[in-house]
Amino acid sequence: MAMIPFPVIDPVATGANICRLRKDRGLTVRDLQSYFGFEEPQAIYKWQRGQSLPSVDNLYALSALLQVPMNEIIIPTSHIVSFEQQAAVCCS
């Protein structure tokens, strides 16, 4: 059984990175709330705490706002899984 690295996003580290990048650009949570058109800022706070991740569309927009590529926002981690385990996740 072959073992391969399976990339996984670290939500807590990614959230901390979103917070850092936002602050580095001099933006507030309210600025992001307004940019995304959210009625409340809770989604931004959840991203920053790692309780949820932005959708792909929101991640793409966030990268434009922060002026960084999407892969500089996401903090990965790796888990080693077998091909069979990966196939079960991807193809079920």
What residues fall within each predicted segment?
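A short, Lys/Arg-rich alpha-helix, primarily the initiator
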Residues: 1-24
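Short, charged recognition helix plus adjacent turn
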Residues: 2-8, 64, 74-92
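Residue-level signal for the short linker/turn that defines the boundary of a DNA-recognition helix
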Residues: 16, 27, 39, 54-57
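Residues within the helices of the helix-turn-helix
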Residues: 19, 30, 60
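The alpha-helix within a helix-turn-helix
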Residues: 22, 33, 63
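Short alpha-helical DNA-recognition segment
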Residues: 26-46
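DNA major-groove recognition helix of helix-turn-helix
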Residues: 47-48, 58, 77
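DNA major-groove recognition helix of helix-turn-helix/homeodomain DNA-binding modules
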Residues: 57-72
